[in-house]
């Protein structure tokens, strides 16, 4: 039976619509704006590319370090929402502040702060999933978040492009127009987040006696130990690390790879928009399919599809082939991220969701860092970006194998639990029958009228 999103689920989805606007800026307008600014500051093209890469790596590293600690703190009663709000505001205000710097280095400082706010807010946002919906609806709701995020982010993006390309017609410079685009996206991000801030309530939490650093570190160590001993969670995180490594690397490096094989800037930009548009309905479809098929099976399909995309990229030498690849990426991009998020949320303790998603974020951020690094190293060693693509393809193979092992571990665990449950039910039934059948010898021991005992049984 189909069920529409309730109000709280819609408000949760809307934050994906808001933050995705900044994510799209990071992969499109910000690199172009920064490189133009850097050139004006006398920084070479190669150095500006390196500086931007360093800034992204630094922000990724900061969140990877803070994530588990913040997640541990957020699992206390009524702490998740304030922390989410703090990091969301850092991201929103930082996005607007990107319009201010005239120095390339200062711009990167603001960018790092903004990226930390953006990524940090997602730790708490992802963990909110257990509070806003049920296990049965997690796949669908998570998929709706990614889907509407993809299509919703196109609204401020298109407005921003119209402002930038129409700057001459309204009498402003391209720099001023781009600065205005940052403010537009910041406002969009803030406004669509308001309903979630007003209505979210943390239902699952841990009762903590103290708030000290020692207690926080101790709890973090406990969670890491629990994950290490829980095969289904540990194996999933390892598999996730490898296959999401390939996904993130394709997202972040597709434009650079496309330019390397001769695709024009216009084709690359339009292909990126196509990916966003295609990802919208496909993410929703996969969320619906998860109601009929096992989530693990759908994730495996997505991993396999991404492997084929990576192999296809080796023969990429024309714009139309890039468009085909962009279409297939759009089909599976939202699905694999959404289903991975909901799958993880269903196999972890709900009262520790922030702690676990803090660890989850480390694996995702680590994968993002490692994937781009390996692609860069292999490309330099073999003097072709296709060598990097082969590395990406191998990540999907490793991730797929480990994920299948994790799925089999889950199935064995479920079978054992079912067997134990059936054995206990049978034991209770037999015990109940024994009590019903046993003759304790009290019946007819005496006649109520004269109280004469018929016989002594004991």
What are the residue ranges of the model-derived segments?
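Helix-loop boundary and gating motifs at the non-cytosolic
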Residues: 3-60, 232-271
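Glycine-rich segments within core transmembrane alpha-helices of 12-TM secondary carriers
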Residues: 142-164, 361-371
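Helix-loop junctions at membrane interfaces in 12-TM secondary transporters
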Residues: 98-111, 314-326
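Structural signature of the two symmetry-related core transmembrane helices
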Residues: 82-96, 297-312
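Juxtamembrane intracellular "pre-TM" segments in multi-pass secondary transporters
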Residues: 2-9, 201-237, 423
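Multi-pass alpha-helical transporter architecture, strongest
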Residues: 188-199, 390-424
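A membrane-interface helix-boundary motif in multi-pass transporters
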Residues: 45-46, 164-187, 377-396
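Helix-to-loop junctions at the C-terminal end of transmembrane segments
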Residues: 65-79, 281-295, 379
